[in-house]
Every structure is written in C-alpha cells, then in structure tokens.
Amino acid sequence: MSVKRRDHILIPKNPDAPLPSLKIEEVGECTIDNIYASPEPFVNGMTMKLSAVKNHGIERDSGEVELAGPMEKIFYNPETTKVAIVTCGGLCPGLNNVIRGLVLNLYNRYHVNNIFGLRWGYEGLVPELSEVQRLTPEIVSDIHQKGGSILGTSRGAQSPEVMAQFLIDNNFNILFTLGGDGTLRGANAINKELRRRKVPITVVGIPKTIDNDICYTDSTFGFQTAVGLSQEAINAVHSEAKSAKNGIGIVRLMGRDAGFIALYASLANGDANLVLIPEIDIPITQICEFVGKRIMSKGHVVIVVAEGALQNQKPKDLDLGTDKSGNILHWDSINYLRDSITKYLKSIGIEEHTIKFVDPSYMIRSAPCSAADAHFCMCLANAAVHVAMAGKTGLVICHHHNNFVSVPIDRTSYYIKRVNTDGPLYTMMTAIEKPK
C-alpha cells in the first residue's frame, strides 16, 4: 500500500483507503496464569487510538495500537524460558540501562533465570562468530552507570535463515533486539523466517536511535541525553566565536536523516543563529549572505549543522555507497560550508575572520544517559518483558502519548521520521535569526 507520513504516523495517500494493519502477531495461545506482574493492572489486549491526522485537509483516525503491559495470561513458562538479548549499530546513551532493565524484570518479576547476551550484534546469532554471555542481576547491577554496551555492537546484515536456526538450535524462546532501522529490519526478517517455519519464538524490537527518527514513537531513549550534552558544544563554540574578531562557530550534531537533535538543542540553548537540518535545503549562497550580514552587525555567528544537512549540494558525480548496515553514506559537508563562507567573506571585504568547528558526536553517543532517559529505559524494558512473556512477536515497543504500545516491526523499520517543517517545532525557529 502506498502511504504518506504525517509527523511519525503512516496513513494511506488516498483518504478513503483502509488504514495499514497494526495487529500484533502471537506465537500461540496464552494458557498460563500471570502471577508475576502484580500489582500492575493487566492490559489484556487493550488498545489506544493514535493521534488524529489531516490527510488532504480531512481529519481522520490513524488507527489503534495495543498497549504494551502485563497480560492476565502468558504464553511462556518462566521456569523453562530462555532469553537472548542483542545490541546492534551505533552506540547510544541508555543501552546498558535497557539491558539491565530487561534482566531485572525477567529475573526478579517473572523468575526467568536463563538470560543471555549475544555479543557483537547480529554476529552473535551466527554459530561460527557467536559469543554468549550469561546475564544475571549481579552482572548488570551497575552497568547503567556506564556508557556503551556491555554486549558490544556491530554493523552489517547476517542471514535471517542462519540467525533463526541459531535460535532454534540453542533453544531460545525470546529474542530482544536493541537497534535502529537497520536492526529492526533484521529483526523483522528473523521473525518472518520463524513464522514461516511455524516455530514459537518471540522477537521483540526495542528502538534505539539517538536521532529520534523511528516512526510511531514520540521519543527514543538517549535522545534527551544527546540534546542536553549538545548544548555544551554549542556553548563552547559560542564562547569561541564571541572571543574572536569576526568569529564563526560551527557545531555538527547527530542527525543523518532527521534534524531533531539540532533543533531541540538549538531551541533549548538559545545561542545558535543558524540551524541546518536535512529536511530543509538552504542554498549555500543564502547561508553565506546570512553569515556575512550577521558578522557585520553582531561580529560573530554560531551555526548548528545536523550531519545530514546540505546533502543535496554535494558534487553530482560523488557516490559514497552504503555502510555495512545498508545506510547511505553521507557527504561530509563541513569543509564545503567552511570554504564557501571563507570565500564569500573575502569577496565582501571581510578578510580577517576565524572559524572554529566542534563535532561532539562520539562523546555524546558513548556517554551514560541522563536521569530522564534512565527512567524511560526502565519503563521501556518493563513493557518489552510483559509483551514478550505473553508471546507477542514481530513488534517494536513505542512510546505514544505517555503510553508504551506495541507496533508491528514492518510499520516502523522501513520509514524514517523527520521534522515536520510545517509543525510547531520548526516554526519556533522563526524566533532565531535565519536566512529568508
């Protein structure tokens, strides 16, 4: 079905067409009384409506999703359940928090003792590459205080058939995958292979993207931490720019396809004069003219650049290919931006100027998460454990209107959530100077 995106919810282009199915698969009938989840109330397949959206000027519902919480009946017997956890892709604040949350909820609430981490991403599901680590409350007790992932990560696709067979051969019942869109596509492929074989193994995706660009979820863990730490970088280049004659400070922040971090950090900090994001392509001539006017009037300028900005201005014959996860490699536009600004300023007689550049990306993504993100991670892990024990599969745990919900993986992993440039977040940027 052809669909279009409204913020982070997918709806058909045709306003009269049926909505995409959001029904969650189950590996079998739940017959075991859930005596483990008390005192949380059972959700038992309760649903909530997604935000109403406008399509061709007509407001319509955008479907219902299942609440992710404890069920009165569960599918798996905790005494015999064996769980695998894998982390894939780039680092993100909160990975260890989610791992810890999964282990504590499985072990202390459902009394599941057989919990294992598969090291180095999806390589952990390939027999000749696999490194398996038992996880207990003692092992994960203080990992939330550290950045990174105790399981390690890797990029690159592996065979769904091989990974499904690994789970079967090693008697795993549940697989939790922590990762971004590429990881979720892999989880979807594993789940489809298991369903094809009619094997009752549950696959639950936990969305991990520091860029906050996964559909159907309002926010992802690590995002708030990234916004907070990004402000420190903006503060630094602001000080550098103000302390130099005709000073120009440039900060590059994460945001391969979406500019949420750049926008949130700039709005929160208040010192950015120009924000460049992938969703808006501002011609380099307008950028340079703005910088020139700002230098002449204020004596300095601060520019925040999302890493995916200015991609439409790269040389047409430049093809960088893709990374191991299949993501298109982006052109490094910073040198182009610096050279263009320098050339323009010299052309209008501003020979003396200084450009200072900061890229805090690796420092941010490898940092421990903030208190708000730590709380979010624990709640996310709690919801994931409940739906997994109930035999729900092929889903991602999303956060919508302060509720954790289950969304089919294929609805979240093949589309990218981007900044709505007609929405309130971007229009608030009108309070900040920008090119006309």
UniProtKB/Swiss-Prot annotation:
GO cellular component: cytoplasm
List of residues binding substrate: T209, I210, D211, M254, G255, R256, E307, Y362, M363, I364, R365
Protein activity control: Activated by nucleoside triphosphates. Inhibited by phosphoenolpyruvate. EDTA and biphosphonates play the role of inhibitors of kinase activity.
Active-site residue numbers: D211
Co-factor(s): Mg(2+)
Gene3D superfamilies membership: 3.40.50.450
EC number: 2.7.1.11
Annotated ATP binding sites: G90, R155, G156, G180, D181, G182, T183
Signal peptide (from-to): none
Keywords tagged on the record: Allosteric enzyme, ATP-binding, Cytoplasm, Glycolysis, Kinase, Magnesium, Metal-binding, Nucleotide-binding, Transferase
Pathway note: Carbohydrate degradation; glycolysis; D-glyceraldehyde 3-phosphate and glycerone phosphate from D-glucose: step 3/4
GO biological process, one term: fructose 6-phosphate metabolic process
pH-dependence of activity, as noted: Optimum pH is 6-7.
InterPro entries associated with the record: ATP_PFK (IPR022953), PFKA (IPR050929), Phosphofructokinase_dom (IPR000023), PKF_sf (IPR035966), PyroP-dep_PFK_TP0108 (IPR012004)
GO molecular function: 6-phosphofructokinase activity; ATP binding; metal ion binding
Pfam family, one: PFK
HAMAP family xref list: Phosphofructokinase_II_X
Function: Catalyzes the phosphorylation of D-fructose 6-phosphate to fructose 1,6-bisphosphate by ATP, the first committing step of glycolysis.
Subunit relationships: Homodimer. Aggregates to a homotetramer after activation by ATP.
The protein's name: ATP-dependent 6-phosphofructokinase
Organism: Entamoeba histolytica (strain ATCC 30459 / HM-1:IMSS / ABRM)
Gene that this sequence comes from: PPi-PFK
